Amino acid sequence: MANTTSAKKATRKIARRTDVNKARRSRVRTFVRQVEEAIASGDADKAKAAFLAAQPELARAASKGVLHSNTASRKVSRLAARVKALSVSPTA
């Protein structure tokens, strides 16, 4: 339990930041899930649109420190590869 005034304030700040970060992380997961669902459905246009919406969310989470920058880059890269593979015609 925090005893000093500054420690109590720090605890309050941590709780606020935790809520903000939790919401941001949830938002990122939602956008990534939308891309994955579009890929699973096989709709290339929908997948590309969802990917273009998810990309800045991942970058924002990385810049705010919610995700490590390498993690965000890895997620973007893997999603981009899957979207690209979906848009390439399988008969070519």
From Swiss-Prot:
One GO CC annotation: cytosol
The keyword Aminoacyl-tRNA synthetase appears for this protein: no
InterPro entries found in the cross-reference section: Ribosomal_bS20, Ribosomal_bS20_sf
Top-rank taxon, per record: Bacteria
Keyword terms, alphabetized: Ribonucleoprotein, Ribosomal protein, RNA-binding, rRNA-binding
Pfam families per record: Ribosomal_S20p
Residue segments, region Disordered: 1-24
One GO MF term: small ribosomal subunit rRNA binding
GO biological process, any: translation
UniProt-listed NCBIfam families: S20
Family the UniProt entry places it in: Belongs to the bacterial ribosomal protein bS20 family.
Function: Binds directly to 16S ribosomal RNA.
Name of protein: Small ribosomal subunit protein bS20
Phylogenetic classification of the source organism: Bacteria, Pseudomonadati, Pseudomonadota, Alphaproteobacteria, Hyphomicrobiales
